[in-house]
């Protein structure tokens, strides 16, 4: 899971 990465994308 890359949940923390999704937030960085925004």
UniProtKB/Swiss-Prot annotation:
MF GO annotations: ion channel regulator activity; toxin activity
A GO CC annotation given for this chain: extracellular region
According to its UniProt record, where is this protein mainly located? secreted
* Keywords, alphabetical: Amidation, Ion channel impairing toxin, Neurotoxin, Proton-gated sodium channel impairing toxin, Secreted, Toxin
List-wise, which residues carry Phenylalanine amide?
Answer: 10
Question: Among its keywords, does the record have Transferase?
Answer: no
- Taxonomic superkingdom: Eukaryota
* Cellular localisation: Secreted
Give a brief account of the tissues where this protein occurs: Expressed by the venom gland.
Q: Tell whether Secreted is among the UniProt keywords.
A: yes
Q: How is it modified after translation?
A: Is either amidated (Sa112) or non-amidated (Sa12b).
**What family does the Swiss-Prot or TrEMBL record give for this protein?**
Belongs to the FARP (FMRFamide related peptide) family.
> What does the record give as the function of this protein?
May be directly involved in a paralyzing effect, by inhibiting muscle contraction, or may also act centrally to modulate prey behaviors. The non-amidated form (Sa12b) potently inhibits ASIC current in rat DRG neurons (IC(50)=81 nM) when preincubated before activation by acidic pH. Has no consistent action on the time course of desensitization or the sustained component of the current. Has no activity when coapplied with acidic pH, suggesting that the peptide needs to interact with the channel during its closed state. The amidated form (Sa112) inhibits both the frequency and amplitude of spontaneous contractions of the locust oviducts (tested at 50 nM).
What protein name applies here?
A: FMRFamide-like peptide Sa12b
């Amino acid at each position: 899971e890359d949940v923390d990465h999704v937030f960085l994308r925004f």
